[in-house]
Each structure stands twice: as structure tokens, then as C-alpha cells.
Design a protein with these regions (language model features):
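Short hydrophobic/aromatic patch on the recognition helix
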Residues: 44-54
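Amphipathic alpha-helical segments used for helix-helix packing
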Residues: 89, 102-126
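Hydrophobic/aromatic residues within well-ordered alpha-helical segments
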Residues: 14, 57, 64, 68-72, ...
Length: 204
């Protein structure tokens, strides 16, 4: 049992080192320039150890995005606890995104790389589509709850969820390309507040 635990710990440490090295290289040099050899060299692992953890460079790319999205999901789950109304939950989600936005650092560059590779790499493309559909469905469920509880008036929750996701992704893209142009995280909070107000049952 003890040997198995130690092996699992070493395996997890190796995975973490590979991901950390890949994240830095993807952000600084780009996906295409980064090679498996360069990741292994920076992580201090053999290629055999790399391929034991990941079948390809693309799978490392996907794992980095999924790890980052897992933190976003935790923020969203936390925002839905406490029995607040849906508009207040969305405000809390936006605040969580704002927080992540300011601490994510190089991850935003990786997100841009991820989008760019979606046209050329089938694995990356599949995961990008899954990500978009996942969050579109999530926002639709949130809006449907708002309608059920009486806090929102939405005729087409699918369309409204698409609008919310488009606003979020559009602001993320602008923030990546022009990081000093605005406080993009704070702007996202304001934009989502306006969208929620437009769907609110309360009269202005």
C-alpha cells in the first residue's frame, strides 16, 4: 500500500512539473514552437515519463485548459450556494471571473493559443467545442432557474445564454489582445449586470 501511494505521489509530481513547464513555454513561445523535447527538458523528465502521463503535446494543452476551467467551475459552484436569487448568483460569478482574470496571468495567452489551434488540431477543436457547449448549457440552466423563481423574464433562454457567453468570450479576447486598455474583469461585471437587469422582472 505504501509503495503504491508513493508511486502515485511521484506520478502526480511528474504530471505537475510537465504542466508547469508546458504552461510557461506555451505562454512565452507559443504552441507550435514548443516541442515535447523542450517541455521534458524544462520539467526535468524523460520523454518516457512524459508519454506515460500524456499521449501528445495537444493533450497537455487540453489538460492545462481543463485545470484552469476547473477553478472557474469552483467559483461558479460557490456562487450558487447560499440561496441567493439568480441575478445575485450571476453577479457573484462575475466577481469570481474578475478575480481569476487578475490572477490568471499567462493563462490568458494560452487561451488565445488554444482558440488559434482549434482550426488545425482535431483534439483541441473537439475540446473547444465541448467547452463552449458546456458553458452555454450552464448559463441556460441558470437562466431557466431565474425564470422558475420569478426573478427573470426570458422568452428564449438558449438565445440569452448564447448572448451571455458571447459577451464573456468577447471581453476575454479583448483583454488578451489589449490588457492595458481597460479593467476587463471589472467591465465584465458591469456588462453582466446590465444583461441581468435587462432580463429582470423588476421595473426600472
Amino acid at each position: 500500500m505504501g509503495v503504491t501511494v508513493k508511486q502515485e505521489e511521484r506520478s502526480q509530481e511528474t504530471r505537475s512539473r510537465i504542466l508547469a513547464a508546458a504552461e510557461q513555454s506555451f505562454a512565452q513561445r507559443g504552441y507550435d514552437v514548443t516541442s515535447v523535447d523542450s517541455i521534458c527538458h524544462a520539467a526535468g523528465v524523460s520523454k518516457g515519463a512524459f508519454y506515460h502521463q500524456f499521449p501528445s503535446k495537444g493533450s497537455v494543452f487540453v489538460a492545462l485548459l481543463n485545470d484552469w476551467l476547473a477553478e472557474l467551475d469552483r467559483q461558479f459552484v460557490a456562487a450558487q450556494t447560499g440561496g441567493e436569487s439568480v441575478p445575485r448568483q450571476v453577479a457573484a460569478m462575475a466577481a469570481g471571473v474578475n478575480e481569476i482574470y487578475h490572477v490568471a496571468g499567462t493563462k490568458w495567452n494560452i487561451l488565445l493559443e488554444f482558440w488559434a489551434k482549434s482550426k488545425a488540431d482535431p483534439e483541441v477543436a473537439r475540446n473547444t467545442v465541448e467547452m463552449i457547449r458546456k458553458y452555454q448549457g450552464f448559463f441556460q440552466q441558470v437562466l431557466d432557474r431565474g425564470v422558475s423563481e420569478g426573478s427573470l423574464r426570458v422568452e428564449n433562454s438558449n438565445l440569452a445564454a448564447t448572448l451571455i457567453l458571447s459577451a464573456v468570450l468577447g471581453l476575454l479576447l479583448q483583454g488578451i489582445l489589449d490588457p492595458e486598455g481597460q479593467d476587463w474583469g471589472a467591465l465584465m461585471q458591469r456588462v453582466l449586470a446590465v444583461l441581468m437587469e435587462s432580463m429582470s422582472r423588476r421595473k426600472p
